[in-house]
Amino acid sequence: MATNIANDLNIKLQYGVYVGTTGPTFETQAEYRYFKAIGGDAVGMSTVPETIVARHMGVPVFGMSVITNCGLSDQKGDHEDVQLQGKLAGERMSKLFVELIKQLYQ
C-alpha cells in the first residue's frame, strides 16, 4: 500500500537491509565498511529495538527511514546537516503518512 501511495505522490522509495546500532553516535568509516560487507544498506539506532518491542506485543509494524547522511562519503557528517536533511524530507514523509492513514481507515 505504501509503495502505491509513494508512486502516486512521486516519492522515490528505496528498499534494503537496515543495520541497527545503539547510538547516538556517528559510526566510524570502519564500521560503515563492515556494515556494507555484511549486506547492510542503511544504518540507524532506533528502529530495531522499537520494532522488537512492538512485534513482541503483537503490534503490526511499518518501518520507514530517511537517510540523512552517507557514512562512506568523503564528506564528514555533522549534526546540523543531519537535522537539515531530515527536515527536507519531512514534507514528503508527512504526505505519505497522511495518505497511508487515510487508506488504512477507509
Describe every region a protein language model picked out:
Residues 1-66, 70, 76, 80-106:
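Glycine-rich phosphate- or other oxyanion-binding loops that anchor nucleotides, phosphorylated ligands
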